[in-house]
């Protein structure tokens, strides 16, 4: 079974009521091909949600680590503003699209990504930008441990 992990912002997301999460869950229910479970990574679950796994999380990085420890064999990291618009299976979703190029680093987030890009180039690794598609992403524990190793 595939697990889809959705980290929640403690303040209820963009609209402060987790409404985006409702749309994301509905799209998964309608369009994910195959068996799945939903895991919400948050301090507290919304009062209205039922039938999901709760993984305690506090902050994005620690939530990702918590999910990886609880689901070491792998999971989809999904955001509450992601929607699955067409029937899609797990193998298709594991192929994360890459942006065609790197955008100009104007925001703090993009400036951090520029540091990542520069390090990849310095180490002779492919400098691919996976940040623009904004998920979903497939992770397992070994990937997370490697990413946070240095």
Where are these regions (language model features)?
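Short beta-strand-to-loop acidic/aromatic patch adjacent to the donor-nucleotide binding site
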Residues: 73-85
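Short catalytic/ligand-binding loop motif for oxyanion handling, primarily in non-cytosolic enzymes
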Residues: 12-14, 46-50, 83-88, 92-94, ...
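Catalytic core and acceptor-binding pocket of nucleotide-sugar-dependent glycosyltransferases
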Residues: 104-150
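N-terminal anchoring/stem segment of glycosyltransferases
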Residues: 1-56
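Conserved donor-nucleotide/metal-binding helix-loop-beta segment in metal-dependent transferases, i.e.
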Residues: 85-117
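A generic secondary-structure signal marking the coil-to-beta-strand transition
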Residues: 2-4, 74, 150
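Buried hydrophobic core signal strongest for RNase H-like alpha/beta domains in large
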Residues: 56-64
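Active-site nucleotide-sugar/metal-binding loop of Leloir-type enzymes
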Residues: 63-74
């Amino acid at each position: 079974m595939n697990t889809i992990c959705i980290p929640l912002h403690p303040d209820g997301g963009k609209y402060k009521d987790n409404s985006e999460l409702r749309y994301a869950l509905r799209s998964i229910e309608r369009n994910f091909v195959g068996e799945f479970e939903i895991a919400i990574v948050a301090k507290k679950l919304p009062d209205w949600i039922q039938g999901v796994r709760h993984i305690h999380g506090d902050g994005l990085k620690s939530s990702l680590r918590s999910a990886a420890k609880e689901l070491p064999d792998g999971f989809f990291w999904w955001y509450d503003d992601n929607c699955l618009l067409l029937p899609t299976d797990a193998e298709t979703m594991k192929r994360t699209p890459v942006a065609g190029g790197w955008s100009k680093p104007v925001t703090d987030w993009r400036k951090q990504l520029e540091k990542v890009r520069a390090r990849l180039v310095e180490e002779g690794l492919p400098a691919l930008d996976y940040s623009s598609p904004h998920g979903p992403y497939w992770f397992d524990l070994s990937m997370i441990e490697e990413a946070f190793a240095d």
